[in-house]
Regions:
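Acidic, proline/glycine-enriched N-terminal capping motif
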Residues: 1-123
Length: 123
């Protein structure tokens, strides 16, 4: 089992429209920048036995007390965990149909990052 930590703020996959090809909304611009960063860093997700943890950054407006209470706790707000996973897999794979065993967790943290734990892939 390997564990890799990437200091990238997780971004969900937005709902795409036809206009997004030429008119970049802020949500789609963040998504395309995220995809480029993932490709640049060469992130890989094994097709089985993978646990992905998305560490969501806490808002700067939160007090130190609230930050301490939420550190490492479950992140039960938007963005949805399935949209975060979809964005990551779409950034890595042209067709992610061969990924068949994956577990995803979303927690609060001081900074945004993606932690991937899993078996070594044969690729």
């Amino acid at each position: 089992m390997t564990k890799k930590i990437y200091d990238i703020v997780p971004v969900p996959k937005p709902r795409m429209t036809r206009a997004d090809k030429w008119k970049k909304r802020p949500a789609t611009a963040r998504y395309w920048a995220f995809k480029n960063e993932v490709k640049l860093r060469g992130i890989n997700v094994p097709e089985m036995g993978t646990h992905i943890t998305f560490v969501m950054p806490m808002p700067a407006s939160w007090s130190k007390k609230k930050r301490a209470e939420h550190l490492g706790e479950a992140h039960q707000q938007k963005p949805d965990v399935d949209n975060l996973t979809k964005a990551l897999l779409d950034a890595i794979y042209e067709d992610d149909a061969h990924v068949w065993d994956i577990r995803t967790t979303k927690i609060w943290g001081e900074v945004g990052r993606i932690i991937i734990e899993g078996m070594e892939s044969n690729e």
